Structure formats: C-alpha cells, structure tokens
C-alpha cells in the first residue's frame, strides 16, 4: 500500500509573523501656504514620502492640487459654498507655496438656486489675463420679478436671453483681460463681476443670484519663482517673531557662592 502525504496536516510556515511596518515612518508633513489675496495663509498640512535616493520629496509635492472652502480661507461662513483649488508650485523648507488653480460651487448651493417660474441663463468665455494665464469662466444668473409685478412667472424671451448672454461674455472678458490672476481672484471673492453684470443687464431684464460659478485654468505661463513670491508676499509673517527682552527685565546672573567663605 502506497503511503501518501496527508494534506490535512498543516505544514508549519517558514519564519515568524512579519511585523507590520508603520506607513507614516517614512513620511514627512509639509505646511500648505495660500496666496496673500486670502486672509488665512496656513491652509493645512500634507504628507509626502521622505527623500530616498533619486526620488526627491519636493518633486512629489509639486503640482499637487488642494481643494479648500473659501469660508476657511476668509473666516466667513457665508462663503462656504465656494470651493477654491490651489496648486503646489514650489517647496521652500517645510512650506508648500501654492497658487490659484480654479474655483467651483458646491452642488447643494447650485441646486438651491434653481427654482420654478424663472429663467436660468448661463454663459462661458475663454479669457487671457495680463500675466498670460488662460482661463475659462462660467457665469450663471436667474430672472426675477419686476417691481409691483402681479404675474407669478418671470420668464425672459429668447431675444432677451441672447442680449443678456452677450453682456455677460463682454463684462467677463473686459474684467479678466485688464488685470493679472491675483487681481482677478480678488474680484471673485466679493462677487464684484456678478454685481456688475446684474447692474448692466437691469435695462434688459431684472436678474438675481448672478455668480461666476466656475473657473478653470486652461493654460499657465512658464513657472517664475519671482512672480510666485509676489503672489505670496511675506509668507513667513504667520510664524511667531522672536522678541528681545527689555533691559530692565533681564535677570542678573547670581554670583557663585564660595563654600566656607
């Protein structure tokens, strides 16, 4: 009778159980710095694998995109529906310097704007800033009732919609092409472009909830560290400053006591 191997008897594995490696042991934390156009400069922190051989940590951080709520950047909860995208452009020490890389609305805000008995008007345009950034801007607006209007609906005619859309494109193009990216972002925060569109189109049809709802950067110029530092200003101002102690508060050194004297 042939004696075979009993497969049910489990064979002992070679070596002991491998110790689970800590995934954070080979990683470093870096501070994310927002451009100076925003009130809050310290956005948060990000992880990256430590420099090993030819794989440099700072190279792994560059062009990383972070999405931040404008409410956190401006300390204003009324701006919580705006999402700002920041792209890592350079690494200095443990600081990641970012620049504006787009803007969007939260889904719940967009859904809350759409209502019955009104017309939704949208427009988009590709523009170029003075510092050679090519952006695509999307605008959204809604019609509203005229003063003392009794009728429930406030629908705009097709010809009026076309006129309003032309005005939107014209204003967006003029506003973007006359300034650089930093100045344009400063216009997005208080929604000054939306207010200008609302004012310019009031003679055609009264509008409400006029917003630049989305901004995409299609093309960016060649990286320039000088321009990036202009965007950030002195990013070190958030860090504590060393203070010199006044002369009257300095503690005099005690004279050493001589034993047996």
From Swiss-Prot:
Alphabetical GO biological process terms: translation
Compartments (UniProt record): Cytoplasm
TM region positions: none
One GO cellular component term noted in the UniProt record for this chain: cytosol
Ranges for region Disordered: 1-23
Keyword Ribonucleoprotein carried by entry: yes
Biased composition regions of type Basic residues, renumbered to the chain: 1-18
UniProt xrefs under SMART domains: Ribosomal_S3Ae
Subunit structure as annotated in this protein's UniProt entry: Component of the small ribosomal subunit. Mature ribosomes consist of a small (40S) and a large (60S) subunit. The 40S subunit contains about 33 different proteins and 1 molecule of RNA (18S). The 60S subunit contains about 49 different proteins and 3 molecules of RNA (25S, 5.8S and 5S).
Family that this chain belongs to: Belongs to the eukaryotic ribosomal protein eS1 family.
Protein name: Small ribosomal subunit protein eS1
Organism expressing this protein natively: Nicotiana tabacum (Common tobacco)
Gene name per UniProt: cyc07
């Amino acid at each position: 009778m042939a004696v075979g191997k009993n497969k049910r008897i489990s064979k002992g594995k070679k070596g002991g159980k491998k110790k689970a490696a800590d995934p954070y042991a080979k990683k470093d934390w870096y501070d994310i710095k927002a451009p100076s156009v925003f009130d809050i400069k310290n956005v948060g922190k990000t992880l990256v694998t430590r420099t090993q051989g030819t794989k440099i940590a700072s190279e792994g951080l560059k062009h990383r995109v972070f999405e931040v709520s404008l409410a956190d950047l401006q300390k204003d909860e009324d701006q919580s529906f705006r999402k700002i995208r920041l792209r890592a452009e350079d690494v200095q020490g443990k600081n990641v310097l970012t620049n504006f890389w787009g803007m969007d609305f939260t889904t719940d805000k967009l859904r809350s704007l759409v209502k019955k008995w009104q017309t939704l008007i949208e427009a988009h345009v590709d523009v170029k800033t003075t510092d050679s950034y090519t952006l695509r801007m999307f605008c959204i607006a809604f019609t509203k009732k005229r003063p003392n209007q009794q009728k429930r609906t406030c629908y705009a005619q097709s010809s009026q919609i076309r006129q309003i859309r032309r005005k939107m494109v014209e204003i967006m193009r003029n506003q973007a092409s006359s300034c650089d990216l930093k100045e344009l972002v400063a216009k997005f925060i208080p929604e000054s472009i939306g207010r200008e569109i609302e004012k310019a189109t009031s003679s055609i049809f009264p509008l409400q909830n006029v917003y630049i709802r989305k901004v995409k950067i299609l093309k960016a110029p060649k990286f320039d560290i000088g321009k990036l530092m202009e965007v950030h200003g002195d990013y070190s101002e958030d860090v504590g400053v060393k203070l010199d102690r006044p002369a009257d508060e300095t503690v005099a050194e005690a004279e050493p006591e001589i034993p047996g004297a």
